[in-house]
Curated annotation (Swiss-Prot):
Keywords: Cell inner membrane, Cell membrane, Membrane, Stress response, Transmembrane, Transmembrane helix
Cellular location(s): Cell inner membrane
Topology of the protein relative to the lipid bilayer: Single-pass membrane protein
Gene name, Swiss-Prot/TrEMBL: yncL
Regulation: induction: Expressed during stationary phase, in minimal glucose or glycerol medium and at 45 degrees Celsius (at protein level).
Signal sequence interval, chain numbering: none
Transmembrane segments: 7-29
Species of origin: Escherichia coli (strain K12)
Name recorded for this polypeptide: Uncharacterized protein YncL
Keyword Transmembrane helix assigned: yes
Gene Ontology cellular-component terms listed: plasma membrane
């Protein structure tokens, strides 16, 4: 795995975590 692919994976991972955190906060953690 080269550096560019790893960077893309990290960006997608952090984007997914951020989106999940936003949804969790919006629903007050009652999921």
């Amino acid at each position: 795995m080269n550096v560019s692919s790893r960077t893309v994976v990290l960006i997608n991972f952090f984007a997914a975590v951020g989106l999940f955190t936003l949804i969790s906060m919006r629903f007050g953690w009652f999921i």
